[in-house]
């Protein structure tokens, strides 16, 4: 659960020693924090997706139907193997982006942070959903962590910028509306 508060201040004096960054540029400071938080969310999401895969493999090896472990069925193997591949690819990408964020100005890697955040948060939800499916009825109960993981990580697709906000950021960089490759605005044809 998250708390939401509304704060309002009037005629407040802030001593110079308490000012963070340049006056009038508070959004820059906040955006830097947002980028840091988004990459942390991405790392957490990849970690939990990895956990869901590992627990699914463990359960599939142990759970037997008709005398055979369900891990012997391709209908169980293939989705888990696909999820594992996605987790490992995204894990490498999140490490790469986190490294870039440590070395470069946040705005120069903002699109990469958005990609990592968007894909990792979706991956966590998909991995939790798969784990519930593999575990069957017990996977949906509170006796296993997957329903909680799904609920917790589903909110990451809303907080720190919704999926749509992340996609918009990616598109803005991709099409030259933002970032280092930003194209100058086209001049309007006045017909003269």
Predicted regions and their residues:
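FAD-binding subdomain of flavoenzyme oxidoreductases
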Residues: 1-5
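Alpha-helical interface subdomain recognition
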Residues: 6-12, 16, 23-192
């Amino acid at each position: 659960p998250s708390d939401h508060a509304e704060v309002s201040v009037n005629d407040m004096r802030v001593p110079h020693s308490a000012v963070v960054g340049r006056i009038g540029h508070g959004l820059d400071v906040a955006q830097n924090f947002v980028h840091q938080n988004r990459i942390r969310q991405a790392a957490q999401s990849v970690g939990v997706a990895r956990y869901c895969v590992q627990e699914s493999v463990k359960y599939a090896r142990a759970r037997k139907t008709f005398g055979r472990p369900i891990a012997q069925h391709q209908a169980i193997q293939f989705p888990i193997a696909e999820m594992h591949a996605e987790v490992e690819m995204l894990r490498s990408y999140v490490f790469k982006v986190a490294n870039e964020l440590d070395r470069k100005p946040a705005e120069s890697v903002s699109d990469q942070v958005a990609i990592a955040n968007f894909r990792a948060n979706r991956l966590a939800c998909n991995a939790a959903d798969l784990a519930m499916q593999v575990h069957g009825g017990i996977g949906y109960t509170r006796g296993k962590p997957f329903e909680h993981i799904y609920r917790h990580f589903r909110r990451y697709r809303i907080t720190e910028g919704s999926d749509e906000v992340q996609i918009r950021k990616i598109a803005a960089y991709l099409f030259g509306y933002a970032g280092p490759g930003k194209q100058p605005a086209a001049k309007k044809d006045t017909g003269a």
